Amino acid sequence: PLMVFARDAPYALPMLQDAAYDVMTVDTTFDGREARNILATSARKAGLMPKQLQGNFDPALLQADNGSGQVEIESAVREMLTLFGPQKYIANLGSGLVGTEDPSKVACFVDCVHNFSEEEVACA
């Protein structure tokens, strides 16, 4: 798949979709539901299906020294997955890792994504 990450450029989502990217990454500043709606509207006008989204978990929650814990990570993951919805979505970060993350927090993020995704599938 052809993927693109346009930081701070949610206005560009329709143009990126039209440019034949398969997956658009949404940064931490933009709402997943809004991104989904923008792509759906743009695709409908073109008579196409909307493309896939990924993102936008805030990696600051994974920093070793920020005071966040499992509860905050779980809450943020659940909110992210709820906003983006289960279809055509890749759970990912809204920007890159910088090397100062707590490995146990990164593991918590991955586990939460798996657990909450399994819950969504079971409820479908």
Give short role names for the model-derived ranges.
Residues 1-124:
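Catalytic-face loop-and-helix region of soluble metabolic enzyme cores
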